[in-house]
C-alpha cells in the first residue's frame, strides 16, 4: 500500500484495485463482478464508471437502495484506514459526468442505472422505491371519521384524561409536528403523571387517535416505549361494533413470535384495566383482537421454486388491516411486494424504530428511519420517545 493515494487513471488500475479491495474485504466478490460485467456489457472503459458500479453494489449489499454521489469521499472513496486511491474528478462536475455514461438514464428512461437528484440507482430498485412511495402517499392522504363511541372509548382507554376540551381525535399533522419538536418528553412514570396533570398531551392517546383516523399509520419508538400497548388499544377501538379481518406480520419467525407474545400479554393487561368500564365499553372487542403473527413471506404465500408469491395485485390479500412489526427490517423489494398485495381499502400500520423510507431521503432499502414520518404530514405518524404503558 502506498504512502499517499494514487490517482485512478485507467480501467486496468481500477480492476486491480477491485481485486485488492475484495481481498481486504472492503468489497465482496459480487461487488467486483458486478462492476466488471457492467463495464463489459456497456463497453464503458471509464475508471470512474467501474468504481461507481462497485460502490453502488456495495450500497445494495449494505441494505441501501442507492448511491448518493454527494456521499463519495474523493480522496478516499472506500473509507480505507489508509487511503490507497483518490478520484481525479471534479466533485462539482461529478453528476454531469455520471449522467453522460451510456448506461445511465434519467427517471423514466429504460436504462440499467438511473440518476435522480444526485442519487445513482439500479433501475430495479428505483422502480421499487417509486412504487412504494406512490402507494404510501396515497394511503397517507386517506382519512376516516371517528364516531362518538370511539371518542368515549378513548377517554376510558386513557385515564386520567389529558384535558376536557371535547376533542378526542387529534389532527395527525398537529400530532406529528408536536411529537417531533417536544424536547421535554420524559421516560419515567412519575414525570409522565406530572405531564398529564399539567395538561400536556398524552402521546399514547394521540398515537391511537390519529392512527384510528388514517389509512396509514406509523408508530415508532425504541424497546419498551409502549408501541404494542398503543396498538392493542387501537385494535380494540377498531373492533368496537365491527368485524375486521386483521393480520399481524413481522420480518422473521423470531420477530413474529415476539409480537404474538406481546399482543397476548397486552390483551390480558387491557382486559384487567378496563374491568371498571364494563358498563360503558364492549369488552368483547378485546377478544376480537388477533394474537397470532406470521412472517411476511408466509402471509404473501411462498411458491416453491419461484421468486413470486401467491398474493399480488391480481390476487390480493383478504384483510382489512395489516400490522407490520419491525417494519424497518423489511427490505425495499419485499415492502413493494407487500403493498402490491394489499387491498386498496385496507389499513396499514407500521411499527418499529424510526423508519427511513425512500423517496423522502436516500434511504436504506431495509427501509424504512425518519422520513415516512417526515413525508406524511397528512398521514398519522407518531414517534414514541416514551409512550407510557397505561
Predicted features along the sequence, with ranges:
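Conserved ATP-binding/catalytic motifs of P-loop helicase motor domains
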Residues: 2-182, 186-390
Amino acid at each position: 500500500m502506498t504512502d499517499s493515494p494514487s490517482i485512478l487513471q485507467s480501467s486496468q488500475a481500477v480492476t486491480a484495485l477491485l481485486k485488492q479491495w475484495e481481498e481486504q474485504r472492503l468489497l465482496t466478490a459480487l461487488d467486483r463482478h458486478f462492476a466488471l460485467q457492467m463495464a463489459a456489457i456497456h463497453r464503458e472503459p471509464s475508471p470512474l464508471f467501474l468504481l461507481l458500479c462497485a460502490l453502488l453494489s456495495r450500497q445494495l449489499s449494505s441494505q441501501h437502495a442507492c448511491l448518493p454521489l454527494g456521499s463519495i469521499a474523493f480522496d478516499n472513496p472506500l473509507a480505507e484506514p489508509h487511503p490507497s486511491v483518490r478520484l481525479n474528478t471534479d466533485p462539482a462536475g461529478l453528476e454531469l459526468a455520471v449522467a453522460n455514461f451510456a448506461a445511465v438514464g434519467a427517471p423514466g428512461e429504460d436504462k440499467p442505472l438511473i440518476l435522480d437528484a444526485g442519487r445513482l440507482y439500479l433501475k430495479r430498485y428505483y422502480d421499487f422505491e417509486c412504487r412504494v412511495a406512490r402507494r404510501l402517499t396515497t394511503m397517507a392522504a386517506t382519512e376516516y371519521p371517528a364516531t362518538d363511541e370511539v371518542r368515549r372509548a378513548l377517554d376510558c382507554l386513557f385515564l386520567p384524561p389529558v384535558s376536557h376540551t371535547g376533542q378526542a381525535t387529534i389532527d395527525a399533522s398537529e400530532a406529528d409536528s408536536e411529537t417531533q419538536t417536544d424536547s421535554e418528553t420524559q421516560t419515567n412514570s412519575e414525570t409522565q403523571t406530572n405531564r398529564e396533570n399539567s395538561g400536556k398531551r398524552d402521546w399514547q392517546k394521540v398515537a391511537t387517535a390519529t392512527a384510528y383516523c388514517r389509512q396509514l399509520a406509523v408508530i415508532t419508538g425504541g424497546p419498551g416505549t409502549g408501541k404494542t400497548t398503543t396498538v392493542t388499544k387501537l385494535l380494540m377501538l377498531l373492533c368496537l361494533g365491527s368485524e375486521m379481518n386483521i393480520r399481524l406480520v413481522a420480518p422473521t419467525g423470531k420477530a413474529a413470535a415476539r409480537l404474538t407474545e406481546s399482543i397476548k400479554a397486552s390483551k390480558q393487561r387491557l382486559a384487567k384495566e378496563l374491568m371498571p368500564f364494563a358498563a360503558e365499553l364492549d369488552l368483547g372487542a378485546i377478544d376480537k383482537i388477533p394474537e397470532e403473527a406470521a412472517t411476511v413471506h408466509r402471509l404473501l404465500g411462498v411458491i416453491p421454486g419461484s421468486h413470486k408469491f401467491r398474493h399480488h395485485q391480481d390476487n390480493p390479500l383478504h384483510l382489512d388491516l395489516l400490522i407490520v412489526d419491525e417494519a424497518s427490517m423489511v427490505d425495499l423489494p419485499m415492502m413493494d411486494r407487500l403493498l402490491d398485495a394489499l387491498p386498496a381499502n385496507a389499513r396499514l400500520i407500521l411499527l418499529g424504530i424510526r423508519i427511513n423510507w425512500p423517496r423522502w431521503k436516500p434511504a436504506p432499502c431495509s427501509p424504512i428511519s425518519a422520513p415516512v414520518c417526515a413525508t406524511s404530514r397528512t398521514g398519522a405518524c407518531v414517534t414514541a420517545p416514551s409512550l407510557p404503558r397505561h
